Amino acid sequence: MVKEISVGNVKIGGDRPLVLIAGPCVIENEVATMRCAERLMTICNGVSIPLIFKASYDKANRTSVNSFRGPGMKDGLKILKKVKEALGVPVLSDIHSIEQVEPAAEVLDVVQIPAFLCRQTDLVVAAARSGKVVNIKKGQFLAPWDMENVAGKAVSTGNDNIILTERGVSFGYNNLVSDMRSFPILRKIGYPVVFDATHSVQLPGGLGGSSGGQREFVEYLGRAAVATGIDGIFMEVHDDPEKALCDGPNSVKLEDLPALLKKLKAIDAIVK
């Protein structure tokens, strides 16, 4: 049985309906972030899907040193706190070093371990010791069963409020594929499982100085993943992906989100 976890006023896992984790790839500025969060809340209320808002304050693993990384931890957390307090929505962001855990945990409902860092024992343990829900993204280089040991590092602290997120596996150069067998394997570990439908269509470094993406496949992979009985869907969204400062090629346009969520919700209702 998959554990049910409370994230603020949202419950994920167990036999609960699908949860959406969504927001911009990176915090571009306060106005844009708040506007995105407000639109997401309106959309999710309209289709009755619980929302956890996500946005990164620092994209520490951008392809190029010249890529936009975000406002930084201090200013970024202030913006996320405003979103949380103004809208009453749980918030998620990623950490990249042990030093970031304590200040991040003061604001975030979910502390996220980036896929590239999921094997960093000290980081996973520190995040879990914060007492917050920890979303561990499966590395593009790991098999799904390898995540049992990763989850075990967090659980060793006494905190078993863990979410496991699949975001594709490396397939040759500049490409990722999503193996649908991963989801039942991950769920057998015992924690809620989320599919990152937008990073899974990323083409890492595919544009030379930045990553490309194939957002036209987000819906197809999302529908397939939800059909396996996953607990949540993770999507990066933007009102104008072509102008997004990070991961625009694989971000979902906000105006396209309601129709997609209705389809995913219908599939979720059938399989649960």
From Swiss-Prot:
EC code: 2.5.1.55
Query: What biological processes does GO assign it?
Result: keto-3-deoxy-D-manno-octulosonic acid biosynthetic process
Q: Where found?
A: Cytoplasm
GO terms assigned for molecular function: 3-deoxy-8-phosphooctulonate synthase activity
Q: Does the keyword Glycoprotein apply?
A: no
Which UniProt keywords are given for this protein, alphabetically ordered? Cytoplasm, Lipopolysaccharide biosynthesis, Transferase
Please give the superkingdom of this protein's source. Answer: Bacteria
Question: Main EC class of this protein?
Answer: transferase
Instruction: Provide the Gene Ontology terms for cellular component.
Output: cytoplasm
Sorted alphabetically, which Pfam families does this protein's record hold? DAHP_synth_1
UniProt feature coiled coil, ranges: none
Q: Which reaction does it catalyse?
A: D-arabinose 5-phosphate + phosphoenolpyruvate + H2O = 3-deoxy-alpha-D-manno-2-octulosonate-8-phosphate + phosphate
PANTHER family per record: PHOSPHO-2-DEHYDRO-3-DEOXYHEPTONATE ALDOLASE
Its family remark reads:
Belongs to the KdsA family.
Q: Write down what this protein is called.
A: 2-dehydro-3-deoxyphosphooctonate aldolase
Naturally occurring in which organism (per UniProt)? Geotalea uraniireducens (strain Rf4)
Quick one: which gene encodes this?
kdsA
